[in-house]
Swiss-Prot record:
The lineage of its organism: Bacteria, Pseudomonadati, Pseudomonadota, Gammaproteobacteria, Enterobacterales. NCBIfam families: aa-his-dipept, PRK15026.1. Optimum pH is 9. The keyword Cytoplasm does not apply. The modification N6-acetyllysine is found at residue 296. PANTHER family: CYTOSOL NON-SPECIFIC DIPEPTIDASE. One of its GO terms (molecular function) is metallodipeptidase activity. Dipeptidase with broad substrate specificity. Requires dipeptide substrates with an unblocked N-terminus and the amino group in the alpha or beta position. Non-protein amino acids and proline are not accepted in the C-terminal position, whereas some dipeptide amides and formyl amino acids are hydrolyzed. Also shows cysteinylglycinase activity, which is sufficient for E.coli to utilize cysteinylglycine as a cysteine source. Zn(2+) 1 binds at residues 115, 146, 457. This is Cytosol non-specific dipeptidase. Pfam families: M20_dimer, Peptidase_M20. It comes from Escherichia coli (strain K12). Binds 2 Zn(2+) ions per subunit. Can also use Co(2+). Zn(2+) 2 binds at residues 76, 115, 169. Optimum temperature is 37 degrees Celsius.
Length: 485
């Protein structure tokens, strides 16, 4: 039995513990999907899958609720696979190890997958709990949301029967989400030429580590360090001065996670090693001063390494460094309409260098299409100046807020009655699948709720136990209050 079984509501936590035990990173959700299909069939529910693998489970209304508007509870099957550098974990094979730490549930050295595992568990717990009162009910579990919203893109019209969709992918209890940002991936690929490292040069690995990382939408406004940007800043400041040879540069693992670590392999002449060490120490102190409140565990390490690879020629080195150093990152503009909400942002998520190419992979988010288009244009111009090949792809729409949404008003009234306080109505600067659902289901009334999750998309991810109880109370009470057709 899982340690989580002592928590309330127990059915939800037991299901979440089971979800944690089955590997389900993006593109590897099939084992979990098969388990859920079998679980639902065993309980006698109607189950279907579509051509992209989405799961739809139907349950009839409880007695006396047959005339209520049908509702679909929606979550995504995949989780973001992030781990600490010293954690040995294969996300495709190893279970997540959740544990209780005071008021929170965390995972040992990895992302927890509360995003969106708690939402998924809550939907399945509603199906399983015979004490929950509800009208005609569907549960929709989508594929590969975190890596490209594949399931939402593939969702066909005339499959769902519901009039109301409750998305469970929000991460702040007491807040009701009625809109979200859209996004687009942007890559710049730069050709590299190499030459042998001169004799008498010593090779080092420069590592920037210890950053918090996090969700590139929900936490982009916080001002956390971006490992790719911070490491290239050092190279931009000192490459020519040190006659530095750049052999390798890699940073970040996911375009939708703020990168926590970046690595550069460099070589300098033996008589400049002491200068390099001094500059590294000085730069580390500069960063610790600048990010003293946000990144207390930041570390910049310089380690001597063996090397048999060629280095970039000076032109390739300088072009790459200048391109990455000049690439914007973070908040581009705050919204004039939604106060306190980021309108447009950019995350320089992944930098991958091979022998003759380097790819810079960014994720652009915006509440408005024109904001997204502007950043694409800016990055395209920058890439072309550097001679890089650029591509924008994988665009997904935002979810336009509807101030007159009946379900949003119902959630607000229900929350206020249950907890004697007014919830915040919010637009989130992150991608929810609701925007894509609006295309095949334009008349669907939608809202997004969830418990408090901090540090999503990072090994610091944790979910607040009490908030899960509040979220469950709200969700189950809301299902009782859904109006008649």
């Amino acid at each position: 039995m899982s340690e989580l079984s002592q928590l309330s509501p127990q059915p939800l936590w037991d299901i979440f513990a089971k979800i944690c035990s089955i590997p389900h990173p993006s593109y590897h959700e099939e084992q979990l999907a098969e388990y859920i299909v079998g679980w639902a069939k065993e309980k006698g529910f109607h189950v279907e899958r579509d051509q992209v693998g989405n799961i739809l489970i139907r349950k009839p209304a409880t007695a006396g609720m047959e005339n209520r508007k049908p509702v679909v509870l929606q979550a995504h099957l995949d989780m973001v696979p992030q781990k600490n550098n010293d954690t040995v974990h294969d996300f495709t094979k190893d279970p997540i190890q959740p544990y209780i730490d005071g008021e929170w549930v965390k995972a040992r050295g990895t992302t927890l997958g509360a995003d969106n595992g708690i939402g998924m568990a809550s939907a399945l717990a509603v199906l399983a709990d015979e004490n929950v009162v509800h009208g005609p009910l569907e549960v929709l579990l989508t594929m590969t949301e975190e890596a490209g919203m594949d399931g939402a893109f593939g969702l066909q019209g005339n499959w769902l029967q519901a009039d109301i969709l409750i998305n469970t992918d929000s991460e702040e209890e007491g807040e009701i989400y009625m809109g979200c940002a859209g996004g687009i991936d942007f890559t710049s690929n730069l050709h590299l030429d190499r030459e042998a490292v001169p004799a008498g040069f010593e090779t080092f690995k420069l590592t920037l580590k210890g950053l918090k990382g996090g969700h590139s939408g929900g936490e982009i406004h916080v001002g956390l360090g971006n490992a790719n940007k911070l490491l290239v800043r050092f190279l931009a400041g000192h490459a020519e001065e040190l006659d530095l040879r750049l052999i390798d540069f890699n940073g970040g693992t996911l375009r939708n996670a703020i990168p926590r670590e970046a690595f550069a392999t460099i070589a300098v002449a033996a008589d400049k090693v002491d200068v390099l060490k001094s500059l590294v120490n000085t730069y580390q102190e500069i960063l610790k001063n600048e990010l003293a409140e946000k990144e207390k565990n930041l570390a910049l390490l310089l380690d001597s390494v063996a090397n048999d690879k060629a280095a970039l020629i000076a032109k390739s080195r300088d072009t790459f460094i200048r391109l990455l150093n000049a690439t914007p990152n973070g908040v581009i503009r705050n919204s004039d309409v939604a106060k306190g909400v980021v309108e447009t942002s950019l995350n320089v998520g992944v930098v991958t260098m091979t022998d003759n190419n380097v790819e810079i992979h960014c994720l652009i988010r915006s509440l408005i299409d024109s904001g997204k288009d502007y950043v694409v244009s800016m990055l395209d111009s920058l890439g072309k100046l550097a001679g890089a090949k650029t591509e924008a792809k994988g665009a997904y729409p935002g979810w336009q807020p509807d101030a007159n949404s009946p379900v949003m008003h119902l959630v607000r009234e229900t929350y206020q009655r249950l907890f004697n306080k007014t919830p915040n109505i919010q637009i989130i600067h992150a991608g929810l699948e609701c925007g894509l659902f609006k295309k095949p289901y334009p008349e669907m009334d939608m809202v997004s709720i969830g418990p408090t999750i901090t540090g999503p998309h990072s090994p610091d991810e944790q979910v607040h136990i009490e908030s899960v109880g509040h979220y469950w109370t709200l969700l189950t009470e809301l299902l009782k209050e859904i109006p008649a057709k």
